[in-house]
């Protein structure tokens, strides 16, 4: 109970911190006074990302692991200008190991064992797992980073089709609803172990990077939805969407309905509620309360879910 109370206290403060996103560097806003949450504070994104072409409907989005973000190792050139053996930086090796390790998460969870198996699948020694911490946080953050990159790619490709007149622009509420579902479906191959992943992300040392990834994700969703706001609505819209994502994620972990139908029904209701809110002081108040309550609920729910089989 003491641990839950401590985490809850941290989350309560972070709920309001998310409403003050000025502390995060931003890049895509129309106004120089309106920041945009910086992308992927953690993880190892490559310069040549190989991604699958996603279906236009989020309902058809693949539930399997996404394409790897890989790149060939650079060539080392000595002082004479002759190329020597291929050389990979430590960061590149870590990136490849973590990506390979995701294949073994369904069997081993977010553990050093999964990382060791990933290293061995690349022909490396299992001792390479010692490059990472023992709590699995680096593997989890790597996965979240990849999922966010995949979502960004999906939304970017759809925007291009709309601009070319090859697809119809959806209403904001439907666009956001489909974007959240698309992102949550990426968790399905790992849903058995996702409660444990969230409990690790809620550890004090992991909250800053995980919060950064969350704000980056909802910022992408609103950007591609066409949000042009430069006032306080910029913050409230992202805070509300973050709360919707978090609470729907918790429902998903406990959902035993076919294809998570109950989860998507819950998501529909939350999106409708958010779209029906007026731009008033009441909205601002409910925004903060919804986010804090969602994060507080995460702490309590994860306490009950961690280590349990939710799909048996």
From Swiss-Prot:
Regions of compositional bias (Low complexity) in chain numbering: 52-63
Residue numbers of N6-acetyllysine PTMs: 169
Residues covered by region (Disordered): 43-92
Keyword DNA repair attributed: no
Gene Ontology cellular component list: mitochondrial inner membrane; ubiquinone biosynthesis complex
Similarity-based family: Belongs to the COQ9 family.
Domain description: Structurally similar to the bacterial FadR protein (fatty acid metabolism regulator protein).
Name assigned to this protein: Ubiquinone biosynthesis protein COQ9, mitochondrial
């Amino acid at each position: 109970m003491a641990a839950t109370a401590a985490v809850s206290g941290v989350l309560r403060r972070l709920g309001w911190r998310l409403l003050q996103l000025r502390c995060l560097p931003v890049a895509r806003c129309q106004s120089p006074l309106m920041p945009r949450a910086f992308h992927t504070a953690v993880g190892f994104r490559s310069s040549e990302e190989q991604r699958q072409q996603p279906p236009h409907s989020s309902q058809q989005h693949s539930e399997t692991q996404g394409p790897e973000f890989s790149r060939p190792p650079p060539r080392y050139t000595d002082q004479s200008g002759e190329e020597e053996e291929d050389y990979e930086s430590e960061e590149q090796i870590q990136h490849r190991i973590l990506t390979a390790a995701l294949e073994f998460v369904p069997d081993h969870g977010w553990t050093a064992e999964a990382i060791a198996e990933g290293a061995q699948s690349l022909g490396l020694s299992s001792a390479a797992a010692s490059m990472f911490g023992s709590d699995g946080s680096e593997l989890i953050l790597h996965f979240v980073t990849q999922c966010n990159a995949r979502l960004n790619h999906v939304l970017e490709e759809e925007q291009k089709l709309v601009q070319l007149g090859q697809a119809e622009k959806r209403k904001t509420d439907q666009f956001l609803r489909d974007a959240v579902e698309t992102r949550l479906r990426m968790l399905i191959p790992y849903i058995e172990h996702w409660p444990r992943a969230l409990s690790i992300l809620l550890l004090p040392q992991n909250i800053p990077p995980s919060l950064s990834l969350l704000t980056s994700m909802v910022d992408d969703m609103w950007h591609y939805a066409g949000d042009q706001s430069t006032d306080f609505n910029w913050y409230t819209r992202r805070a509300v969407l973050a709360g919707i994502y978090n609470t729907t994620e918790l429902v998903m972990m406990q959902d035993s309905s076919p294809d998570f139908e109950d989860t998507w029904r819950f998501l529909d209701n939350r999106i409708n509620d958010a779209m029906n809110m007026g731009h008033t002081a009441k909205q601002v108040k409910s925004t903060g309360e919804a986010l804090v309550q969602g994060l507080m609920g995460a702490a309590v729910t994860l306490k009950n879910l961690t280590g349990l089989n939710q799909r048996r």
